Amino acid sequence: MKFVDEVKIHVKAGDGGDGAVAWRREKFIPRGGPAGGDGGNGGDVVLEVDPQLSTLLDYRYIREHKARNGEKGSGSDMNGKDGADLVLRVPPGTVVKDAATGEQLCDLGAAGERVVIAKGGRGGLGNMNFASSTNQAPRYAEDGTPGAERDLVLELKLLADVGIVGYPNAGKSTLISRISRARPKIADYPFTTLTPNLGVVGWRERSFVVADIPGLIEGAHAGAGLGHQFLRHVERCRVLIHLVEGANPEPGRAPRADLDAINAELAAYSDELAKKPQIVAVTKIDVPEARAAGVKLQKLLGRRKKPVPVHLVSAVTGEGLDALLDAVGRALFKEARPHRGGGGKKLAKPRARA
C-alpha cells in the first residue's frame, strides 16, 4: 500500500431544502389554510477515526466530497427529508487544518472519534409557519440555507510512543525488525525506507509502539532528502532512539558529527523535538571498526557536563538490544529500577504497517 500522509480536500455540506407554499385542498373546505411543509436539513460532513486505516491514500485522487441536500417541503404539512450525512473515515493521528488560514481545526486520535467539519444548511420554513391573525393565507415560504463548505488539509502524524531517527542506512529498519514483528524493506543503501514502519514491542508486562522514521539528512527541516514530511511523525513520539552508524560512514562523516547534525535538524524543525528524551545507540558493533567508534563516542559524550549514555548494539547478533529496550522502557514508563529479566520480547503482531 502506498503511504500518503498529507492531502488537500474540498468538503461541502448539504444545502437545506426550501419550504413549500401549499394549501389545504379537502372536500367541504373550499378555502383551506396554508399547508406548506418545511424543507429538510442538509447533511453534515463528518470525519470519523477508523483504526483499520493507516494512510490517507483514499483522498489522494478524490478531492471533492459533498453531503446530500435536504429535500423540499410539500403540501399537506409534509416536511422534506433531511439529507444524509457524509462520513469521511481517516486513520488515527489525523490533524485537520483549514487550508486557507492554516488554523488547526481538530486532532483525531481515538478510534471512533467523530467531528462535524462542515455543518449542513437549515431547511426553510413552509408557509404554514407564517400564518397569523392578520395574514391567514401567506403566499411565501423560506428558502433553505446553503451548507458550509471549506478546503481542508489532512495531515497524518503517526501515533507512536518511540521514534527511531538517524541518517539513512544507520540500521533503523534492521533494528525495528529485530525488536518487533514489523518487516520493513531492508537493503544496504540509503533511503531504502521510504515510508514509516510501525511495530509493537513487548517490554516486561507492558508494550509500546515504535516507528522507524525514514532517514534524515542535513537540511531535512527545509525539505532536503525526504524532507520535513517525515519529521512531523516524530512530533508525537514521547522518546527517540537516535541511531548512529558506527561502521563505514561516508567520507567526511563521523558518529559524533552525525549525531550533532541530526539533532540540529530536529531543533530547526521544532523546539519541542529538541527537548524530547533521546536514547543514543551506535549500531553495527558486530564490525570491529564500529565497536571502536562506539567506545570513542561513549567517552566523548561521557565527558560532557551532563553525560549522555551511549548504547552499543548489533541488530545482527542481538548484542546490546536488551539494555537498549530497558533504557527506552524506563524513559517511557518512568521506572528507575533496573530490569532483572530478559530483554524486549516480540509480540505476535505489529500495530500497523504502511
Curated annotation (Swiss-Prot):
**Ranges for the Obg domain?**
1-159
> PROSITE patterns from the xrefs?
G_OBG (PS51710), GTP1_OBG (PS00905), OBG (PS51883)
Domain OBG-type G per the UniProt entry, residue ranges? 160-333
Q: Which UniProt keywords apply?
A: Cytoplasm, GTP-binding, Hydrolase, Magnesium, Metal-binding, Nucleotide-binding
The record's annotation in SUPFAM superfamilies points to: Obg GTP-binding protein N-terminal domain, P-loop containing nucleoside triphosphate hydrolases
Q: Where in the cell is it found?
A: Cytoplasm
The first-level EC class reads hydrolase
Q: Which GO terms describe its molecular function?
A: GTP binding; GTPase activity; magnesium ion binding
Q: Which residues bind Mg(2+)?
A: 173, 193
Enumerate the residues binding GTP: 166-173, 191-195, 212-215, 283-286, 314-316
Cofactor requirements of the protein: Mg(2+)
Q: Write out the GO biological process terms.
A: ribosome biogenesis
Q: Which GO terms describe its cellular component?
A: cytoplasm
A single Pfam family, by name?
GTP1_OBG
User: Under which EC number(s) is this enzyme classified?
Assistant: 3.6.5.-
Q: Which family does it belong to?
A: Belongs to the TRAFAC class OBG-HflX-like GTPase superfamily. OBG GTPase family.
**What job does the chain carry out?**
An essential GTPase which binds GTP, GDP and possibly (p)ppGpp with moderate affinity, with high nucleotide exchange rates and a fairly low GTP hydrolysis rate. Plays a role in control of the cell cycle, stress response, ribosome biogenesis and in those bacteria that undergo differentiation, in morphogenesis control.
Subunit structure, per the record? Answer: Monomer.
Tell me the protein's name. Answer: GTPase Obg
What species was this sequence derived from? Anaeromyxobacter sp. (strain K)
The primary gene name is obg
